[in-house]
Amino acid sequence: MPESNLTKKAIALSAKELTKEKPYDKISISDIADRCGIKRQTFYYHFQDKYELLVWIYFNELFAPNMEDISLENWDEKLGAILTQMQEEKKFYINTIKHAEDYIIQYMLEVAEQTFEEAIDKLDEKSHLKNEERGIFARFFAYGICGIIVEWAKGGMKMAPEKLADYMREMLEKCKQAVYILSLIHISEPT
């Protein structure tokens, strides 16, 4: 593993440890650098600010490992794995969602919207939807799922991750059925 990645992981670990002691918005770059045993300049060599670090952690530790090979058939299992990992590191994820909410939500929305756009493309092979409609549907589902995850985290992650993922799968299945029924109605309508 390149030295740069080792340093980034050490910085990330230090930030995660600090979230057990105080809110993320109260953690300074100096706090992270001191905990990691590096100079502030070293931190800034790797990250622009603590929010870029946070996005790096979410991407490299939560999303990238769990989103690999995601498909329409397994997305709920992948979501369950993400939620389980969040629950295993509950203090970190609750802290960062509560105290860096804008940054985290924006990042989660970008990841979710891209994932849903790809899923909609696969579902709508015959191109019944216009690009504008695809974007709206993708944003609708991205905001819904991200909102549920944020509320789940803020509420203390009380519901089991698998149960929450199952609820989301059921909801999306019902939406998919509704879209199918509407498409049949649309096809059978006289013009």
Question: Locations of the language-model features?
Answer:
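Hydrophobic alpha-helical connector segments
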Residues: M67-N95
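Amphipathic alpha-helical packing segments from all-alpha helical-bundle domains
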Residues: E101-K126, E132-G147, Q177
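Append "Primarily bacterial transcriptional regulators
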Residues: I11, S30-R35, F43, M86
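Conserved small/polar residues in nucleotide/adenosyl-binding loops
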Residues: I185-T191
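Short amphipathic alpha-helical segment with a characteristic S/N-K-E followed by hydrophobic residues
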Residues: I11, K26, I38, D49-L54
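Hydrophobic alpha-helical segments that form the core
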Residues: E132-G155, M159-C175
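Short hydrophobic/aromatic patch on the recognition helix
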Residues: G37-F47, I145
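Basic, helix-initiating cap at the start of DNA-binding domains
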Residues: M1-K22, K26-I27, D31, I185
